[in-house]
From Swiss-Prot:
It comes from Mus musculus (Mouse). The chain crosses the membrane at residues 22-42, 49-71, 75-97, 132-152, 161-181, 202-222, 237-257, 260-280, 305-325, 340-360, 381-401, 448-468, 473-493. It is found in: Endoplasmic reticulum membrane. Belongs to the PIGW family. Residues 43-48, 98-131, 182-201, 258-259, 326-339, 402-447, 494-503 are cytoplasmic. It is a multi-pass membrane protein. This is Glucosaminyl-phosphatidylinositol-acyltransferase PIGW.
Length: 503
């Protein structure tokens, strides 16, 4: 077999891992972000905190990126232990911050909590959604290269037909994250004529057309390894995003934004019925002739074309979630209620997923069926609830230490029900000492360019080295240098105030 055939075989016929393990893996970076924020607050209070760009970059890289690289490789069998370790570290940091608090130092704990619940948080910015999208981008960047090395567990790779691999969540999670901040959600309504709105939607996808066609031409011209049952012969994820964007733009013109969940449920139920009671599933799996033909555009790209219905469902669910999470809330107590609600809905979706897998069909990314949509939405909501909780805890820590502020977190703003002098000090000193260097902010600013850069460097590494026969130590070195280089480029762009856009 040629090197290309060996690499293609290396990522085929895989069945994934458990839903629980993927969920644990998703929660881990949320806890890392929490500990990173608590450590910043603790360091600012206990010792002089270095605010140079190099120090901040190295800290973010070590606390946010390196743990993910290790989790997806050498410590993949100890995800639960990693979570417990980070939680214990975070609890210790919070304990130290509380006992060193500069505000309400002699006030009973009940009174401290009561005053904190009355504090207001900045409503125009939600760090949980930013962190969600960055986590998905970083995970994807690591996985697309790591999957070609033996050190990367095969159970985390994309599944062939049924199953829940960690990389299976990546594609659905990207759609969900993009939907939460789509123009419709940020604007809350379609304020212009339908024709102009559709025209702008069509114009907004042309960079994706360029990227999708460019990827297709490059892959075919250099003979790069492909997994044809993933999207088809010519299709790729850029084309899926294009179709989803256009279809959902049309749906959001026809249906009210706050009814997006009804549209999502309707589409996925009808799609699952079509898979079960029409020849649609047979066509998707075996082609129109039933023998796996790839003749004709539909047969050649049947997986990518048909599965877009599932991704449309996920997008509409993301729109509904974005409307709820980005809704302005007056006080911390309101955000606690919202976090509990998101967590409760996530649990409800996991229960529904179990019922569907037992009685209807297992999760299939290849088909993007009902179970897949439920799994992606449930996992996304669970991650989002962890990030919301982390944001609230960080806000509490900032509330305790006067003048502290964590980049990419909520700002505490004055509340009329809180002690006036303390509220003012929270605002003035925090703004005066506000750190401006943050890897999360940098990655969020240039997410598309980071994804493209990761794809290009992944291709270059695969073309220049034999990844299939690389040892564990060298794999970690390559992955670390790869992520360090990509993150550093994005970080420097952010320092210079540059956003790379192609439109």
């Amino acid at each position: 077999m040629s090197q290309k055939q060996l690499k293609e075989a290396f990522v085929r016929n895989l069945s994934g891992t458990s839903v629980l393990e993927v969920t644990q893996g998703l929660c881990f970076p949320a806890f890392c972000i929490l500990c990173r924020g608590l450590w910043i607050i603790f360091s600012q209070h206990v010792c002089s905190f270095s605010n140079t760009w190099s120090t901040r970059f190295l800290m973010d890289f070590v606390v946010l990126i390196v743990p993910l690289v290790i989790t997806l490789t050498v410590l993949s069998s100890f995800i639960l232990l990693e979570n417990l370790t980070v939680i214990v570290w975070g609890a210790w940091l919070l304990y130290q911050i509380y006992h060193r608090r500069t505000c309400y130092a002699k006030v009973p704990v009940q009174k401290v909590f009561a005053n904190f619940l009355k504090i207001s948080l900045e409503s125009e910015y939600n760090p949980a959604i930013t962190c969600y999208r960055v986590i998905n981008s970083v995970f994807t960047a690591i996985a697309i290269l790591a999957v070609d090395f033996p050190l990367f567990p095969r159970r985390f790779a994309k599944t062939e037909l049924y199953g829940t691999g960690a990389m299976d969540f990546g594609v659905g999670g990207f759609i969900f994250g993009a939907a939460m901040v789509c123009p419709e959600v940020r604007r809350k309504s379609i304020e212009e004529s339908r024709f102009n709105y559709l025209r702008k939607s069509l114009y907004s996808v042309w960079p994706l057309v360029f990227l999708g066609m460019g990827r297709l031409v490059i892959i075919k011209s250099i003979g790069y390894q492909e997994h044809s049952t993933e999207y088809g012969i010519h299709w790729n994820f850029f084309f899926t995003i294009i179709v989803v964007r256009l279809v959902t733009s049309l749906l959001l013109i026809i249906f009210p934004l706050n009814k997006s969940w009804i549209v999502a449920v309707s589409i996925t139920v009808v799609y699952q019925l079509a898979l079960d009671y029409t020849p649609l599933k047979r066509i998707l799996l075996y082609g129109t002739d039933g023998s796996g033909t790839r003749v004709g555009f539909l047969n050649a790209n049947r997986e990518g074309i048909i599965s877009t219905l599932g991704y449309v469902t996920i997008h509409m669910a993301g729109v509904q979630t974005g409307l709820y999470v980005l809704k302005g809330r007056a006080q911390v107590r309101d955000w606690i209620k919202a976090t509990c609600w998101v967590f409760s809905v996530a649990v409800g979706f996991f229960i529904s997923l179990h019922i569907v897998q037992v009685n209807i069909e297992a999760v299939s990314r290849r088909m993007a069926n009902l179970a897949f949509c439920l799994w992606v939405v449930a996992s996304s909501l669970m991650l989002l609830s962890c990030l919301l909780l982390s944001g609230i805890i960080l806000s509490f820590a900032q509330f305790l230490i006067k003048g502290s502020l964590v980049p990419c977190s909520w700002k505490l703003i004055q509340s009329p029900t809180t002690h006036k002098n303390h509220s003012e000090s929270l605002i003035l000193e925090a703004e005066k000492n506000q750190p401006s260097l943050c890897l999360i902010t940098a990655l969020n600013r240039n997410q598309l360019f980071f994804f493209l850069l990761s794809n290009i460097t992944t291709g270059l590494i695969n073309l220049t080295m034999d990844t299939l026969h690389t040892g564990a130590l060298w794999t970690l070195v390559v992955l670390s240098i790869y992520m360090f280089t990509n993150c550093l480029v994005i970080y420097v762009l952010d320092l210079q105030g540059k956003t790379i856009k192609f439109w």
